[in-house]
A protein has these predicted regions:
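Cofactor-/ligand-binding subdomain signature composed of acidic, glycine-rich
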Residues: 1-36, 58, 260, 275-278, ...
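Glycine-rich ThDP/TPP pyrophosphate-binding loop and its adjacent helix/strand module
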Residues: 110-306
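Cofactor-binding active-site loop characterized by glycine-rich and histidine/acidic residues
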Residues: 24-27, 32-164, 182-192, 197-199
Length: 316
């Protein structure tokens, strides 16, 4: 395991499991009607947040999209702040005004997410420009999905970042679908070919290969930080649930069964567990991590829900 110690592997698993359990808790409780905002879950897409957590630096900044819970948590955002935000409480990370798609925690460098597709891409580039002007040694993570690469502002932003040599990393989570429309129906050539003319260093990660993504993230960060240049990392991934909401929508058959089976065999948590087992990390250790995380997530959500119900009672 090149440059990847057992401790890092455990940290990677902890974050991936933490993100998944946090979102599962949201999904399991969503039908109660106490969360009253549209919610885009990233269950199945935990690789990027888990990798980002290994490079945690509160001085590095991040912006994200409508599907931002994982990025927020991976960057170190407050879990009570997230759950309270979903419940519309003043103690939420956006004061209860933003809901699921408008998260922020500047204390860890998470500068915000928005609901409009591609909206935060130029914001991230602006932050990178400010970092360069202030001669700081930081970078900006700009998280986006494959659908956002079809917006004009994406190309304007990577052009400007390349032209001005700005320290930012565009991390594209490509889950193959924009709502129900697959990639082949929307794009006739791969993104890697489209961006060649912009002179930006490009990396591709496939099949939930976390060791590969760790290495590429390491290279991209060193490059962007030292050379003050942008980079693009495209990560092929898969969302387990519907585009927006807590349910599975596989019965709609817009995703091929072979495609679904292939991805179910590439589950990121199972991938990491296999590597943990190879490195003599016991099932007992893994189960202890799971149990501790389950307790934290469940108790935090329950506390948030109780605050919401108390507030609701007072308003009646």
């Amino acid at each position: 395991m090149t440059n990847f110690k057992k401790e890092k592997l455990l940290d990677l698993y902890k974050t991936a499991y933490f993100v998944r359990r946090s979102e599962e808790e949201i999904a399991n409780n969503y039908r109660k009607g106490n969360i009253r905002c549209p919610t885009h879950l990233s269950i199945g897409q935990e690789l990027v947040p888990a990798i980002i957590s290994l490079f945690k630096n509160n001085s590095d900044l991040a912006v994200s999209s409508h599907r931002s819970h994982g990025h927020y948590l991976g960057k170190g955002g407050s879990l009570p702040g997230l759950f309270d935000e979903l419940h519309g409480l003043e103690t939420g990370c956006s004061g209860g005004n933003g809901g699921s798609m408008h998260l922020i925690d500047t204390s860890v460098g998470f500068m915000g997410s928005t609901a409009i597709v591609a909206n935060t891409i130029p914001v991230g580039v602006g932050l990178a420009s400010a970092i360069k002007l202030d001669r700081l040694n930081n970078v900006v993570y700009i998280f986006l999905g494959d659908g956002a690469t079809e917006e004009g502002v994406f190309y304007e932003s990577i052009h400007y970042a390349s032209l001005k040599k700005l320290p930012c990393i565009f991390i594209i989570e490509n889950n193959n679908f924009s709502v129900y429309t697959n990639l082949k129906s929307r794009q006739n050539i791969p993104l890697s070919q489209k961006i060649k003319g912009f002179g930006i260093k490009y990396f591709l990660n496939e099949k939930n290969n976390f060791l590969d993504l760790y290495e590429k993230m390491n290279i991209a960060l060193d490059y962007s930080r030292s050379a003050k240049e942008p980079a693009i990392i495209e990560v092929m991934t898969h969302r387990y649930l519907e585009h927006c909401g807590p349910n599975s929508d596989d019965h709609l058959n817009y995703r091929d069964k072979t495609f679904l089976n292939d991805w179910s065999n590439l589950d990121i948590l199972e991938n990491i567990k296999l590597e943990l087992n190879k490195n003599y990390i016991s099932e007992h250790t893994i189960n202890s991590i799971n149990e501790e995380t389950d307790l934290i997530v469940k108790s935090t959500f329950t506390e948030s829900e109780e605050k919401f119900l108390l507030k609701l009672k007072k308003t009646k």
